[in-house]
Amino acid sequence: MYLKETIDSFASNANILKLLKKDAQFNHHCIEEMVSKGTELIYNRDREYFYLIEQGYVKYEYDGQLGRRFHFLFGPGSFPFLPIYEDDVPNISKIEMLADVRWWRVEFSFFKKVMRVEDPRNYILLAYMARTRRELYAITIQDRLNSQDRIYFSLLSLIDLGFRQKNNSVELPIFLTYKRLAEFSNTSKGYTSKVLSELRAKKILISSKKPWVITDVEELRRLLGADQLPQLP
């Protein structure tokens, strides 16, 4: 059994870069890049690099073996993908910049070489796999919900990428739009607009200008019935 705080601290952006910079070849294998909002990058199974996000947000998307499309959102401190098993790498995947992004492009072979010495307990991989487990579990739960609840669920899921104003009030990420929320919730834009209008009428959401604000997180959780949803075992 590991302490979450220990794993998360070791796998933080700052510590990963600190460990990589211990190697004198760091500047030859790690490059800091700026990528503009709206840029889309397509990847095949050959993954020579992975990316460590310092600023901005991205959407990582791929099609599963049965044709199901998966998407995941990542912000500062995350890496959209980390190729652990070759067989698990999708044939085609895409990263879309939801905002201007600054990240480190890291050669995976260099990362493996350094971490054999600096992370012998594989804390960084454990943190990545734990996060992936939570995300896939959330997708499973969301798939069981009706259209309205999927929208509620998506809004609540975006809290971690937002800015908490008060204990019960959160600014949502600036990239969020009706179209994006409909996409994340697997609903139509028209139905999404209707549900958001109802939330505004109940004084739960402010979406007339950006950033959108959930003004009553607990009430939104109550509408979803969040406490009754299955929890990650």
PLM feature spans:
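Polybasic "coupling" helices that flank or enter modular domains
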Residues: 122-184
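Phosphate-/nucleic-acid-contacting segments
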Residues: 161-233
